Every structure is written in structure tokens, then in C-alpha cells.
Amino acid sequence: MKKIKYPDYMNSTVSLANSVLKYFGAPVHHETLALLDRELAEREYENVVLLLLDGMGKCIIDGNLEPDGFFASHLAGTYSAVFPPTTVAATTSICSGLYPVEHCWLGWDCYYPKIDKTVTVFLNREAGTTKPAADYPVAKTLCPYQSLVEQIRENSG
């Protein structure tokens, strides 16, 4: 039987986002990612760009890319995804510095009792249709969060 791999919440995508907050002087919500903290401390960066490659885990790199290729040869370390490891939950965690249980953006399609609809979250459509779920962004309205950029701007004086 395969061993269950649990998320390492001390070394995760949420930690990465919190390192960015820390670097720009914004309050952090959780542990930071030591590897990124060290990298950011080496120089004074005016901008930090995060490139999120959905589904690009270590096993994908090892199994599909050349060892001397760009990604494999520049790999500095690994960290855990959040749980649930869905595109929506992971992306929102990177964008907010919060765990899915805190931001509540859990999956591609989520049911919102307040409007009695299942919404394709990132598209703001009724699930399985092209029809807008509402005339406002449902998930952002009912489960609001501040993006990293908003948090940094708010705390930059």
C-alpha cells in the first residue's frame, strides 16, 4: 500500500506567499519559506515575480524533463501544496498567503447557499454553463480576501 504524503505546512505554497509579504514589510499570516527568505535577503529587489505553473510538481520534473534542462537544473528546493491541492485552492493560497480553510476557495466548482447556485469560481459562471452566476463576482464577494499586492500596498505607508 502506498504511503500517504501529508502537506508540510511549515514548508508550503502558503509559506512562499508569506515570505513575499515579509520581504515587503507586510504582516505575515503563517510561517515563511526559509529557502525564499534566504534568497530575498541576498539582494534588495524592487519587484518579486511569482510564476505559478499549475501541476508542475517534483515528480513531473523528474519524470518528464531533462536533468540538465532549465527547470531541473535551477531547482533550489521543494515545498508542499495546500490541501485540497486543487487549482483554485492552491492559486488562491499563493495569491493571499492564506490556507484554503481561511479563504474558502476550495475547488473549481463551489456551491454557494446564499445564491443557491454552484459556481465555476474563477469564471464566475453557473457550473456547466456559460451563464454568469451573478452580476457581481460571487466568490470574491461571498469569500473575500486581500491579495498579496493589496496587502503590500496597504502596509507600504
Describe these PLM feature segments:
Residues 1-35:
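N- or domain-start disorder-to-order transition segments that initiate the globular core
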Residues 5, 45, 50, 80-83:
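Generic structural signal for short, flexible, solvent-exposed coil/loop and linker residues
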Residues 7-19, 58-157:
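Active-site-proximal alpha/beta segments of enzymes that process anionic O-linked groups
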Residues 33-45:
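A short acidic-Thr-Gly-centered motif at the start of a beta-strand
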Residues 34, 54, 76-77:
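Short secondary-structure boundary micro-motifs
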Residues 46-58, 94:
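Beta-strand elements within well-structured catalytic alpha/beta cores of enzymes
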